[in-house]
Amino acid sequence: MVIDWGNGRIQKIEDPSSMTGGVVYRYGNKGSYEVKIWAEELQLIDISGLLLPLSNLYLGNMPRMKSLALNSISDTRKLDLNTFCPNVESINIGRLADLERLEIGNCSRLRSIQIYSNPKLTSIEFGSHPETESLYCSYNGLSSLSLKNLPALRNIDLSSNERLSRLELNEETSISAILIQGCAFQSITDILKCCSSLRELSCSYNKLTELDLSGCSNISELRCEHNQLTRLMVPQGSLLEHLYCHSNQLDEDALNTLFDSLGQVVNPAIYYPTSLRQYRISFNDNPGADDCNRSILNDKNWIVENK
C-alpha cells in the first residue's frame, strides 16, 4: 500500500495488517491536503475520525475489498462505491454529517449494509443485492425506501428515520425482524402481508391506528407502544415473550379481545422454581386499562408490567 499524504510525503507500507491501531499520520501545519491511496490488495478499509473533514473522498479500484467502514466524516456530500469496490461484502457508513448521495447499486455481493446517522441522506437506491441478509439504516433523513431488490433480507432496522412513512418489500419474504420505531408510518398493513415469517416487530412511536398481526403466526416480540392504536390483533394462541402496547387508544373491548387471543402459559413444575420463559405484557395508559378484565391474563399466567 502506498499513501501520498499531499504534503510531499509518500509512505509505503508493505503489510498494512501489521500496523497495530491502523495507519496514523499527523500534519505539522493546519490546512487542506489531497490524500491518495493505492492499495489494490486491501480487503478492509476503516476511515474514522472526529468529524474528519474530507471534501473529495475518492477511492480507486479495489477489487479485493471485502469490508469498508467510513465514520465521523464531514464535508463529503457524495459517495460512489459502485466502481472502486464491486466485490465488497460489508459496508459501515455512519455519521457523515453532510452526505446527500450514496451510490451502491453495483455492489452486488453485499451481505451486510449499515448506513446510519447521516441526517442529510434523504434517499437510497439499491441495485440488485441478492445476498444481503441484514440492513441497518437508522437515523437518516429517509421518507420512503424500496427493498424489492434485496430478496434474502432477514433483519431490517430503519428506526428513527423521523420522516419515513413508506416501505416497499417483495410479496414473499423471509424477514424475521423489522425495527421501525420512531418513524412516521400511519399504516403497515402492506408490509405485514409480505412478512409471514416475522418473529420480531418494533413499531413504537409512529402514527398507527390499527395493527393486525393475525397472519404472522411466528411473532414472539411486539413493541407497538406510543401509537394511536384503537385495535390490535395477534394470532390466536400467541405466546409473545414481550407484548408492549401501552400508551395507545385501546378501549376495554379491544383489550379484552387481545387478552382472549393470547396463549396459555404453562405453570412450571413444582420442583422447578420458575418457568424457562416468561411472557410479559404492558397495556397501561390506554382508555380501557382500568376497566378491562385482567383476570384473563392472571388465569393464563401472563406477567403484567407497567411502563
What are these regions (language model features)?
Residues V2-D4:
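Beta-strand signatures of extracellular beta-sandwich domains
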Residues A39, G49, S72, T83, ...:
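Residues on the solvent-exposed faces and adjacent turns
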Residues Q236-K307:
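Leucine-rich solenoid repeat scaffolds
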Residues R9-K78, N82-E89, C195:
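LRR N-terminal entry segment and analogous cap-like coil->beta motifs
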Residues L59-N61, L79-C85, I104-C107, E125-P130, ...:
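A structural signal for leucine-rich repeat
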Residues N140, N161, C183, N206, ...:
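Consensus "Asn ladder" position of solenoid repeat domains
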Residues I45, L57, K66-L70, L79, ...:
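Conserved hydrophobic beta-strand positions in leucine-rich repeat
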Residues L42, L54, M65, T76, ...:
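Conserved hydrophobic position(s) of the canonical leucine-rich repeat
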